[in-house]
């Protein structure tokens, strides 16, 4: 509905999160032949390092908002991401590939929903995030890294997030576990993977997901050393906060059915007069 879209424009909309991912950019130098001459060209290519293990915990606190007769579910949540990145890796360097500064990135569909400045704990070091995902102007946050940061792959990130209607998270870990609970009694579990277990009661819900790269094919979706960044069609864990049928919807349906029955009655009389040549009413 237009009212819901208006509320999303003035606050924050549906949220989809992709991350955390370590991105190692390289300057790729190559030679190109054009019109009988050879020119030196450069492009940026990317290597993606995905978590070995990723554990996500979230608590969704939903507050219904209303605009006119329309309602939308606005939520706030603190998402905790813990896990580890592989540490046994070598940054490639040659005449054709020159490494740039690596960074850890999080992509969000609506960065307006970030309520506080998050920090990355990588090993024993705290690193502040900067605005922007640093990936082709996509919304999100990123934290620059160096060789000392990458020596310890254990990480922890806490993200305070606001959104509306739904929350989707891409399981980027080799092994991903996700627990989400909330105070909304009507969750709708959609996305590419259903919860392995869930409960829904009047005072809220709880759900658990678990998957691996064997099911998500996530490693293939992040092709390394390519100028294109990644496959946009990533699988997600997704929960939608649906609104049960309310009195306004019942009244709207009743009015539409009333118009339908009245219209069908007049059409029936009209067809009877046309086909039979008889007047139903003497006037």
What are these model-derived regions, one by one?
Residues 4-33:
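Short extracytoplasmic
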């Amino acid at each position: 509905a237009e009212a819901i879209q208006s509320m999303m424009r003035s606050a924050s909309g549906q949220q989809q999160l992709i991350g955390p991912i370590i991105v190692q950019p390289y300057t790729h130098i190559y030679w190109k032949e054009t019109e009988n001459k050879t020119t030196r060209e450069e492009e940026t290519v990317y290597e993606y390092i995905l978590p070995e293990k990723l554990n996500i915990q979230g608590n969704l606190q939903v507050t219904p908002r209303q605009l006119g007769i329309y309602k939308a579910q606005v939520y706030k949540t603190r998402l905790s991401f813990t896990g580890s990145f592989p540490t046994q890796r070598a940054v490639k360097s040659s005449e054709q590939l020159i490494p740039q500064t690596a960074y850890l990135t999080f992509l969000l569909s609506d960065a307006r929903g970030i309520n506080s400045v998050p920090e990355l704990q990588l090993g024993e070091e705290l690193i502040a995030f900067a605005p922007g995902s640093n990936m082709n102007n996509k919304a999100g946050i990123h934290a620059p890294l160096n060789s000392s940061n990458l020596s310890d792959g254990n990480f922890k990130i806490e993200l305070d997030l606001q959104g509306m209607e739904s929350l989707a998270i891409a399981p980027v870990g080799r092994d991903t576990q996700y627990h989400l609970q909330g105070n909304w009694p009507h969750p709708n579990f959609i996305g590419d993977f259903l919860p392995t277990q869930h409960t829904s009661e009047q005072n809220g819900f709880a759900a658990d997901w678990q998957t691996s790269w064997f099911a998500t094919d996530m490693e293939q979706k992040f092709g390394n050393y390519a100028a294109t960044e990644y496959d946009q069609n990533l699988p997600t864990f997704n929960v939608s906060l649906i609104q049960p049928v309310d009195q306004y919807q019942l009244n709207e349906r009743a009015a539409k059915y009333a118009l339908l029955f009245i219209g069908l009655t007049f059409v029936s009389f009209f067809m009877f007069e046309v086909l039979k040549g008889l007047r139903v009413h003497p006037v």
